[in-house]
């Protein structure tokens, strides 16, 4: 398992000049609010779902790879109750890339403020959970939801495995769970995924292979960025 004590610098060949027929293939890896904010900015340079041209001289083709270690709030409850991947970060990324910035996006972000069993859940999380139950495939549920929201790009969970983030702190103590790691005041010595050896989706590896640009973050280094890099084959 790679140590998280040092941060590697990723380098890649300078991409070829953007042409009208060749968009810049961008793969954005991360999670949390940082990734969704980045995607909202990139969206303006992505062609519409019906082929509408972009404004300006640049066009990008967007793939988002989203961490699936969240275990707090609505996502954590759904993980524990339904044994599914946490939907929250993926939901936020879908809304960020959606062409619909009106009622439908507001609906997916709506969070229930009352109701036994409903309080704290967002509609979009419940929608993804229901589609996962229907299809039996979380990645397929994400694709179907993305079509409904008419997103400008593709979104993949970093792995289809239901993994737990663990950290070894500087004092040697082990902490399990993203939410507990975030609350820890001790320096982090190393980060792990359990079970180890989880694999990414085939589509994720294909997107990385053809990428002109790969972005990491912005977001929490240990809980939003590095967990993706612990999945075998990413990047």
Model regions and ranges:
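Conserved catalytic alpha/beta core of Sir2/sirtuin-type deacylases, generalized to analogous enzyme cores
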Residues: 2-26, 33-64, 126-215, 220-235
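Glycine-rich nucleotide/cofactor/substrate-binding loop typically near the N-terminus or early
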Residues: 55-138, 147-149, 154
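Short polar catalytic/cofactor-binding loops
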Residues: 31-34, 69-70
